[in-house]
Amino acid sequence: MRSKARARKLAKSDGDVVNNMYEPDPDLLAGQSAEEETEDGILSPIPMGPPSPFPTSEDFTPKEGSPYEAPVYIPEDIPIPPDFELRESSIPGAGLGIWAKRKMEIGERFGPYVVTPRAALKEADFGWEMLTDTEVSSQESCIKKQISEDLGSEKFCVDANQAGSGSWLKYIRVACSCDDQNLAMCQINEQIYYKVIKDIEPGEELLVHVKEGAYSLGVMAPSLDEDPTFRCDECDELFQCRLDLRRHKKYACSSAGAQLYEGLGEELKPEGLGVGSDGQAHECKDCERMFPNKYSLEQHMIVHTEEREYKCDQCPKAFNWKSNLIRHQMSHDSGKRFECENCVKVFTDPSNLQRHIRSQHVGARAHACPDCGKTFATSSGLKQHKHIHSTVKPFICEVCHKSYTQFSNLCRHKRMHADCRTQIKCKDCGQMFSTTSSLNKHRRFCEGKNHYTPGSIFTPGLPLTPSPMMDKTKPSPTLNHGGLGFSEYFPSRPHPGSLPFSAAPPAFPALTPGFPGIFPPSLYPRPPLLPPTPLLKSPLNHAQDAKLPSPLGNPALPLVSAVSNSSQGATAATGSEEKFDGRLEDAYAEKVKNRSPDMSDGSDFEDINTTTGTDLDTTTGTGSDLDSDLDSDRDKGKDKGKPVESKPEFGGASVPPGAMNSVAEVPAFYSQHSFFPPPEEQLLTASGAAGDSIKAIASIAEKYFGPGFMSMQEKKLGSLPYHSVFPFQFLPNFPHSLYPFTDRALAHNLLVKAEPKSPRDALKVGGPSAECPFDLTTKPKEAKPALLAPKVPLIPSSGEEQPLDLSIGSRARASQNGGGREPRKNHVYGERKPGVSEGLPKVCPAQLPQQPSLHYAKPSPFFMDPIYRVEKRKVADPVGVLKEKYLRPSPLLFHPQMSAIETMTEKLESFAAMKADSGSSLQPLPHHPFNFRSPPPTLSDPILRKGKERYTCRYCGKIFPRSANLTRHLRTHTGEQPYRCKYCDRSFSISSNLQRHVRNIHNKEKPFKCHLCNRCFGQQTNLDRHLKKHEHEGAPVSQHSGVLTNHLGTSASSPTSESDNHALLDEKEDSYFSEIRNFIANSEMNQASTRMDKRPEIQDLDSNPPCPGSASAKPEDVEEEEEEELEEEDDDSLAGKSQEDTVSPTPEPQGVYEDEEDEEPPSLTMGFDHTRRCVEERGGGLLALEPTPTFGKGLDLRRAAEEAFEVKDVLNSTLDSEVLKQTLYRQAKNQAYAMMLSLSEDTPLHAPSQSSLDAWLNITGPSSESGAFNPINHL
């Protein structure tokens, strides 16, 4: 314990000491000094050198020469209790004193004593000096008094002479002798009081005496919680308890001791007391305390003779605490004392003083951030904070290479790796990792073998499992993830025994690889497993079902065939399919037998235990080296064009040599589309119309999205062997003619990426591809009998208008799905004109060349992209705005937890109609695939919630990475606002908001200045918003349609030139209707006869109960999105380019361009006249389509029915302008989607024979003869 300080009254002389205890007030205002605290009317004598070494004498400069010459008057500002009066004291030269007006009995207390801490005292009569025990000695003529320990570390004075303080106790004077004393000081509850120790008669002055020789420490109560004191009647000494008083009377009191022991026999006297024969007690020479015998005195002397470790080198004093020694040494050299100007603390080192000022006083947080204005007490804190603005993250995790701005965050992150009990081994370089995410990052830059060749990390690691999509009656022994109905949408595979989750139904482990466009590779590894085809019973999956059951009643087709280097390869493949299927069954049986022991070692992805791929409980990597060797062998075999033997890790894709011309390319489709099994239509006979349509879409996609989406790895090693779009082959209702999973050539060109050709050049490529036996140019009527069967239609349609995604994802989708079934090596989307016919009757998926797939940098799924923007225009839905911000395509699109999928639920539910139709051979799903809110009981909780439940909000279920985030989030539910402004009592839930409030509102700090008009702002965001206004005002009229305003009314800057607009258009790739215009312009119109041929099938689909949608039942958010896209197309067609400025309130053509992902677009201001004019003007240009072959069935994205206005009704309605504008906007977008969709419908595009507006209006409603789309029937 630290030595406790003592209080002493500064003495005027050796005999006259003042006893005036104090209670220091820590709230000393800055700038006050002792010189300011004198009282004009009360004059004190000049101190005659205080005994304390504290240099206060030089500060005592009395205003008058002598206290005897000073006039004595009674201050009016001091309230005196009615029991007392203030008049001249009986002590000579003391000035005023307190006199009693009534009788005061023993034990009464007066107080508390009001004092103020000071560095020095102006008048010694009205203050006390704080000293430590060791600084007080008997010759200093002061009493030792303990005070609060936290004040004992500093030496300072307290002043009771503050004007207006109301402390009348300061006028209690010091008695000349102890006989005149009638008061004693005591400390109760950290307050100083005077206590009556003698009866005081009326007219008697209150006096205190603290002569140390007369009264010891017991006179003053040392305890903060003082009990009633007891006074000795003989010597007037006070004691804290009655026992001490009795002991004192028996042994110590000189008057009572002799009488006590005279009556006691020798045998009754206390043993060892050693009372002298003369009956005299023993006195301590240091503290003058009396003891009854020598033994007690010796025990007491230990206190005085205790060895003290810290001794002063300038005087004999020693101290128990180093701090006391330092404080004492300051008295020897006052020049080295550094006093704080704001408080009474004194420091020996200037650095300590500076640290004290920064941390304790106003302006302490002197280090301000130049970017955001946040202040810090230390420069190191500011330096660490600046990392936030500079994007510098110096603290990097060595396991997963994630970086942080603060070391504490890195430590918190590392605790996540501690949960990983196993290591994941890179199959290329052998490096071990504790998380799949770190392994995934490593793979991007791994210097080992080629990752993207079919024999590398994307080698099939698991046998393919059959999907129950086509045949629900046959149980699948190897199916483990079908319980939720996810097997219909996501790849199913045997569940490795090493994975911790249940082997029964949970399909979520397969969910992540099933959504590569949703979950980027930064969160998940690129799994080497070969998923099955969910739509078809795969012969590779099940030995009992070696033949592919055709849902359309056609003969079973081989699932894998050879990719020939010549056009003869296709004929050989189709000619040997029966023979090949038989061999394939044997190959798969052998593969399953050999592969099963190595089930848990075949691929890195098998180590993933949750959807995050982070918490791993399995062992892995034991077979990695073997797999790598086998991969290398397989690569060699493929390069040489030799057959590859059936190997356990080959994934069941091995094929006998007799089935093809080049067996080396047999497993290409599966190994490279590790996520995507072949679509249904690819396994059937090819449709020339579908191929032509795909080429049309591919041309547009290549033109606008071409090589720009290829990542660095693709540029070095070729395109990724998987798609980064939504796997529509898992969706039974999706027309796979729109989403072909073509294969790439497996020769050397996998490693060489040729320069992409423009879509027009690609369309001009004449001859058939040597590696693409699939006829991309078969005319619709030629392929129709082989493609469709009357029993089961491929694409159910409900007559509603399902919008095609025209956003960045659509272009990405077009480049991948509709990218023409062309050889992958050229990275083009078509090499033949749509009209060229090559007439190959049948096709095998392995023969289908693969179109380029986008890298995960832009993972926009084909049908998910409208979902991303579905609430983009909902200004009134801030929650949706926040969701949209994080649902936009980006490299870090979703958090790996299942909560990310939970946030997608609302959007995905609007596409609920993608379930299998009850009227088709595909049975309806037992559980909605996207109903993540209420998963069936078969879904295990660990998979759903992961491991950080301790940071889960109990109100809304949100999961946070750290407790601080959860604490702050909970305040949104509880309404707690713990941070209160001291100026205006306004409360905040976040401390940074309070600091910003104080800076901007109360301190009027506006550090952000506009360089154009010198206007200042308190926040950077306000300045940015202001600068946007300058840009808008200074931009030409033609560019005023480029300013994008968000939901707060702020605007984002727009380019100042047309070239900049186009540059931003290419960067953001959000010019939807520019794509529509060019799409239609580059498409050719086809004959209308094929439309009526397929109407019976479409009518048959309309009768399906699960598909009750119509064009008027679109979700409002999707309609809004469609309206926005139409408006952009309107403005593009009128203004001639995509622009970024705010939509003007006038009907002047203006485009809405999304400058930033998280910004809200402005409210729509397009009038009906403007819409009609845009539609009519575009009728002759955009709608004058060239003959274009039809696609397969249109996309049937049925959604939950919501009310929507028909365009014709809106034209005649009397709704207010805002509703009219919004409705027109939605309907216009619907029409735009229908225009794209018309190219994929069986309905051909006719030459324009009606007015443009009528043609558009015909799109909205189902035709009278069927409920299918009737898009632009009469254009």
Curated annotation (Swiss-Prot):
Protein EC: 2.1.1.367
A GO-annotated cellular component: nucleoplasm
Main subcellular location: nucleus
CDD domains membership: PR-SET_PRDM16 (cd19213)
Comp. bias intervals (Polar residues): 1038-1058
Top-rank lineage group of the source organism: Eukaryota
Family indicated by similarity: Belongs to the PRDM16 family.
Tissues/organs with expression: Enriched in BAT compared to WAT. Detected in heart, lung, kidney and brain. Expressed in nuclei of cardiomyocytes.
Signal sequence coordinates: none
Region (Interaction with CTBP1, CTBP2 and ZNF516): 680-1038
Keywords, in A-Z order: Activator, Cytoplasm, Differentiation, DNA-binding, Metal-binding, Methyltransferase, Nucleus, Repeat, Repressor, Transcription, Transcription regulation, Transferase, Zinc, Zinc-finger
Biased composition (Low complexity): 610-625
Region feature (Disordered): 1-66, 592-658, 789-838, 1027-1065, 1084-1169
Bias kind Basic residues: ranges: 1-10
Subunit description: Interacts with CEBPA, CEBPB and CEBPD; the interaction is direct. Interacts with PPARG and PPARA; controls brown adipocytes. Interacts with CTBP1 and CTBP2; represses the expression of WAT-specific genes. Interacts with PPARGC1A and PPARGC1B; interaction with PPARGC1A or PPARGC1B activates the transcription of BAT-specific gene. Interacts with HDAC1, SKI and SMAD2; the interaction with SKI promotes the recruitment of SMAD3-HDAC1 complex on the promoter of TGF-beta target genes.
Protein name: Histone-lysine N-methyltransferase PRDM16
Observed effect of gene inactivation: Mice die at birth but embryos display altered brown adipose tissue differentiation.
GO BP of this protein: brown fat cell differentiation; heterochromatin organization; methylation; negative regulation of DNA-templated transcription; negative regulation of granulocyte differentiation; negative regulation of transcription by RNA polymerase II; negative regulation of transforming growth factor beta receptor signaling pathway; neurogenesis
Compositional bias (Acidic residues): 1117-1133
Basic and acidic residues: bias regions: 631-648, 821-835
Reactions that this protein is recorded to catalyse: L-lysyl(9)-[histone H3] + S-adenosyl-L-methionine = N(6)-methyl-L-lysyl(9)-[histone H3] + S-adenosyl-L-homocysteine + H(+)
Region: Mediates interaction with SKI and regulation of TGF-beta signaling, residue numbers: 740-1275
PROSITE patterns: SET, ZINC_FINGER_C2H2_1, ZINC_FINGER_C2H2_2
Task performed by this protein: Binds DNA and functions as a transcriptional regulator. Displays histone methyltransferase activity and monomethylates 'Lys-9' of histone H3 (H3K9me1) in vitro. Probably catalyzes the monomethylation of free histone H3 in the cytoplasm which is then transported to the nucleus and incorporated into nucleosomes where SUV39H methyltransferases use it as a substrate to catalyze histone H3 'Lys-9' trimethylation. Likely to be one of the primary histone methyltransferases along with MECOM/PRDM3 that direct cytoplasmic H3K9me1 methylation.
SUPFAM superfamilies assigned: beta-beta-alpha zinc fingers (SSF57667), SET domain (SSF82199)
